[in-house]
């Protein structure tokens, strides 16, 4: 079977799954893994795991992971008028909320709605230029009152996702909601396809994880079961090629997958990843040998599961591959199919390496700067 990056990505983007409600994506991931993998399971939290490669008990264990959930909302209250108050799940960009189309997972099926906005003709002062506070926003599903909304299948706790089906833009770019992190899920399926008939010297565990956007720790039960020697995460990173971010960094779409040197989130979570230099060298050398374009990134304000995985068990060496993405956590994220394909190529090359090529143990001499 020929793997199509675009078709696979678009099929995943058409699914909805905020944190804690990833089943539709998990079902697709599990079914795809079961076509080739030696062993596939879904744990009690909903993480989907597939094992490829060596069955030897002492084989080096490489875990590659990406999260299935997307940012969104949850219904908090149904007003007597039938309008819905809601809370954020994860960090959807609040500035984009008013006027957005949303999908609600009703008891009997999906329901369309929109986030209301004060009529521009009657808006005054800051109301015309500043987004309202979250507690001033509401969702309109066309219900005439609370009882009508309940008859339509809405209740407190109903999941809500942003609505924007995938579209193709120019130069291999795509626009959609939930590119964070269906890009990573697509990469997992691309690697799975590549490894299906390939003998490996190591054991590779592909993990589609849950609740990254909510608590960043949904994957923890998996790593305690798998006990990997090395973990590599796949996620998005802000692309800084737009007019508002050009002075921030050189990370750009269509210039290869990002290799994270540092990410850090200090607003409450206080965690992040400083990638060990030996792993940076491994990633850059492998990319160079396979003619795969990569770009380094330092990303304060960004955090992934690696921030917590690295301090589990006896300490797990971690690295992160980041696919540049414009307009993150908005209904219209933009990323490159070319960068996604490069990510799949790099991960596949890593999975095909011999155990001796993985620098698991820390260096004992002076730290050397990573270089290809």
Swiss-Prot record:
The active site is at residue 212. Its EC number is 3.4.11.-. Gene3D superfamilies: Peptidase M42, domain 2, Zn peptidases. One of its GO terms (biological process) is proteolysis. Binds 2 divalent metal cations per subunit. A divalent metal cation 2 binds at residues 180, 213, 329. Its cofactor is a divalent metal cation. One of its GO terms (molecular function) is metalloaminopeptidase activity. It is an enzyme of class 3 (hydrolase). Keywords: Aminopeptidase, Hydrolase, Metal-binding, Metalloprotease, Protease. A divalent metal cation 1 binds at residues 67, 180, 235. Belongs to the peptidase M42 family. This is Putative aminopeptidase SgcX. The gene is sgcX.
